[in-house]
Amino acid sequence: HEALQLMQHAEEDWQALLREWLNAILKTGPVAQTKWVEEISRLGREKQKQFLRYFNHLLEQAIHYRIMGEKLNIGEKERDFAERLNKIAGIEQQQAIIEELDRASYYIERNANGKMLFHALTIKLYHIIQDKIVFLVD
């Protein structure tokens, strides 16, 4: 029971952190983005990778929800988040974000500087969402 509570608590923390990040990217701008990057940089590599996996999971759910609609069996919070993600990003953008998150996770495993990585990721996500740009990588 305690492990389940810890998991739910961690998920709520991740969701709050993700909401903060997306708001910084889309609404509040550079000062909030820098503050958020400072915050995630303090978490350590494993937590950073967990956060990226969590965001990836939500993006995959959003894509499934877009395709399956009400038939998809997900929780109320996840459904709400999926609907919001689907409003701000199309499938191509969501897939591009998933690829960027996977790449970031890979770089974290290889000792990338957390601050630089999350600053760059923030800028990439801004352009993917706002400008509907998908980065093509070899």
Placement of each model-derived feature along the sequence:
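Charged, glycine-rich active-site and insertion segments that engage polyanionic ligands
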Residues: 1-54, 58-138
